[in-house]
């Protein structure tokens, strides 16, 4: 191999390695900032298609209906704790330390974003409530079997997060 070809080959290999390294760093940065959407059932049992569960400490979004009678407020602070359930009746406890949206109430659809703790609770940093009686966030509607109607709470059909 003559020196000119060797120099070109070295340059091409270095360029390919550099592009691959930059692409892997970009994908790593994007992956750490992803907020994956889960229903309570998917948090407990894993995604339907892959069976993958969210990891402890992972930043996720959860969508579902606020369980009737589950909201507990701390009288001395803004801390509130409530359960979110889906169409299967599976529940996950959500804790939040800020003002809840005006439209937030039990029996309504919400999307909460936060970090999953080792106790199976979601420490929410943001809670979004649906806008009116007929609206349901698209992610929640799709995850709950494309039912664009309010789920009825059934007593006795409760599952809580256990880790």
Swiss-Prot record:
Keyword Cell inner membrane: yes
Molecular function via GO: heme binding; metal ion binding
Bilayer-spanning residue ranges: 9-29
Residue intervals annotated with topology Periplasmic: 30-163
Membrane topology: Single-pass type II membrane protein
Sorted UniProt keywords: Cell inner membrane, Cell membrane, Cytochrome c-type biogenesis, Heme, Iron, Membrane, Metal-binding, Signal-anchor, Transmembrane, Transmembrane helix
Coiled-coil intervals, chain numbering: none
GO-annotated biological processes: cytochrome complex assembly
Paired cysteines (S-S): none
Any Pfam family hit: CcmE
Cytoplasm as UniProt keyword: no
Annotated signal sequence range: none
Family recorded in the similarity comment: Belongs to the CcmE/CycJ family.
Protein's job: Heme chaperone required for the biogenesis of c-type cytochromes. Transiently binds heme delivered by CcmC and transfers the heme to apo-cytochromes in a process facilitated by CcmF and CcmH.
The protein's name in its UniProt record: Cytochrome c-type biogenesis protein CcmE
Organism: Shewanella denitrificans (strain OS217 / ATCC BAA-1090 / DSM 15013)
């Amino acid at each position: 191999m003559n020196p000119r070809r060797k120099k070109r080959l070295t340059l091409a290999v270095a360029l390919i390695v550099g592009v691959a390294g930059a692409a892997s760093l970009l994908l790593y940065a994007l992956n750490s900032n992803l907020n994956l959407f889960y229903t309570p059932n998917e948090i407990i049992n894993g995604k339907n298609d892959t069976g993958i569960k969210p990891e402890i400490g992972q930043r996720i979004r959860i969508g579902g209906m606020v369980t009737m009678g589950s909201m507990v407020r701390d009288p001395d602070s803004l801390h509130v704790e409530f359960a979110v359930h889906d169409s299967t009746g599976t529940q996950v406890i959500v804790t939040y330390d800020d003002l809840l949206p005006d439209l937030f109430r039990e029996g309504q659809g919400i999307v909460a974003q936060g970090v999953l703790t080792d106790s199976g609770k979601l420490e929410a940093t943001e809670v979004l409530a649906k806008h009116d009686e007929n609206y349901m966030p698209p992610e929640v509607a799709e995850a709950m079997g494309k039912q664009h109607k309010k789920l009825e709470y059934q007593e006795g059909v409760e599952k809580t997060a256990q880790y």
